[in-house]
């Protein structure tokens, strides 16, 4: 009961008209991946776009707060590196290859440029701590001037509160 009240106060649902575009079509969770196509990779996003599916992608913060498209908090599963992505500088993450030759970990700006409004994109901000401001600001800046349909979500209610208090 108290948790739901806090969620409602910190992260109220958006007006239905603002998110209506999210309904009525399939979404590829982390892009359309599998059988030689790695999740949250440019190839997974291109496969989803080809089928007209919207895209859900995950965003993590580098040490400096910049937004990278990567699901896991740790690098181990999808790269040959170990440890948390949040402990690395953007310049270092730019050099990390995804496993099996799937390119580098993309920055959110690169993914938005690739999608280029061809399908809607749902950006999930992943944050395990209370310091969400730098990552939220990075996402907002990446979305400035983006011509396509996009929405931001998070399971951390502080993210929704940040966007409510700091503009859309």
Regions found by a protein language model. Name each.
Residues 1-168:
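Phosphate-group recognition and catalysis centered on beta-loop-alpha active-site segments
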């Amino acid at each position: 009961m108290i948790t739901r009240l806090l969620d409602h106060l910190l992260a109220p649902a958006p007006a239905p008209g603002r998110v209506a575009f999210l309904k009525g079509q399939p979404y590829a969770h982390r892009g359309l991946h599998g059988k030689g196509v790695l999740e949250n990779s440019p190839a997974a996003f291109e496969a989803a776009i080809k089928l007209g599916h919207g895209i859900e992608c995950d965003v993590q913060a580098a040490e400096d707060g910049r937004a990278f498209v990567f699901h896991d908090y740790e690098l181990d599963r999808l790269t040959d590196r170990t440890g948390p992505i949040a402990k690395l500088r953007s310049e270092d993450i730019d050099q990390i290859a995804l496993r099996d030759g799937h390119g580098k970990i993309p920055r959110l700006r690169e993914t938005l440029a690739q999608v280029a409004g061809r399908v809607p994109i749902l950006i999930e901000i992943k944050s395990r701590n209370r310091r969400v401001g730098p990552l939220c600001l990075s996402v907002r800046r990446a979305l400035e001037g983006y011509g396509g349909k996009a929405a931001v979500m998070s399971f951390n209610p502080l993210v929704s509160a940040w966007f409510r208090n700091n503009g859309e």
